[in-house]
Amino acid sequence: MSISIFVKTKIPHYISTAIFSAVILGISQQPIGFGFLAWIAFIPWLKILVKLRDFKQIILSFFTFGFFYHLITIFWLAFNIGTNQWVATVSMVSTVIFLSIMILPGAVVWYILQKSTTSQLFAFPIVWTVLEYFRSLGTLAFPWVSIANTQLSFIYPIQIAEYTGVYGVSFWILLVNIAIYKSIKSKQINTWLITAGIFSFPWIVGIIIMETEELQNNDFVSTAVVQPNIHLSEKWEDSLKIQHVNTLIELSTPSMKENIDLIVWPETALPVYLLKSGRRYLRNIREELKNSPSKILTGIPHYDYIDKEYLSYNSVVMFDRTELFGIYKKIQLVPMAEYVPLSGVFPSLSDLNFGQANFIRGKEYTLYPLKEWSFGAVICFESTLPKLIRQFVLEGANFITIVVNDGWYETA
């Protein structure tokens, strides 16, 4: 069946099919989450791509695909209430354009290999996966849009990430698209059998992993996640701080009485400098913990005063009724939200005010003890970074917790 029935329009096919495939891939991501569509999303676009010979058309097609896919995937960035609507929208569109440009090396490789369709199709999943890897590195890393994320609902195939990382899942999705495309073109049973094998392999591996993994009775940590639902317009009001702290204590009291191992509060849950001027709040919380072995993990604002300069951090701390177990300072900050890029080189950039914070990047991979294990606590965006999570594991983390403040997006 001709793809043209889906895209009868005056827009060139190399643009319209790029949009069509981008939309299909976009709705396979959360929050819509039709993850199964990722297995076929690239096929309409590939049918047109293999016919293109003009460099400009290939570049435009790749950019168009990237623009609409990323727009659908991260459109919600424009609804950040931490800044004005204009800044939030410009920030979102700029991010979409930046991410779309980052896939253009794939267009260059596609053009170079145009004499061999087989080479193009073979290289496509490799190049795309490599680009995903590089997109996860550096201060401008943004792996949030990895196509592997489309498979969150499929517990079995994503088990291969234990051995391949998230990139193996992305590669598998791309390979399935290529295999189905080739099978449709060849119409040979052998090709379809190979495609079935490619598709089934991670499912089989995942089932084996899940079914053979044996958990001991003590291989668990009892956890309570507390969501105070405090609006950002009220959170930092001085007159309401004690009320907010009391809300968190009240919501956590049942878990304390049940001796839950770990009680998790959100990112910057406490609107006070808990380890500085806010120690009276820490005493209040510990008073409630006096008869409980529970530990509380919470996000806090924090600062150090070094060389007559205040250095602010987005941080996490864990404590119980008697002991403080160290502080983690967020390592991977969000550009233009938590700091201004290059402000370390040009300090005057920190004076720009787009509604962003001016945090300092942490350096230590802090681990927290819990029963016989250790764990790392990452903050919000950091949870998307494979390299950072891997480093926590290399440092000795047995598991990872994530604290996040989605109050920036009221309908999150």
Language-model features and meaning:
Residues 138-141, 217, 307-311:
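Short glycine/proline-enriched turns and hinge-like loops at secondary-structure junctions
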Residues 147, 226, 328:
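Hydrophobic residues at beta-strand termini and immediately following loops
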Residues 153-155, 199-265, 272-287:
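Membrane-interface segments at or immediately adjacent to transmembrane helices
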Residues 112, 250-254, 391:
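A generic secondary-structure signal
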Residues 29-44, 69-76, 227-229, 259-273, ...:
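Short, conserved active-site loops that position catalytic residues or coordinate cofactors/metal ions
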Residues 240, 246, 257, 262-412:
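Solvent-exposed soluble domains appended to multi-pass membrane proteins
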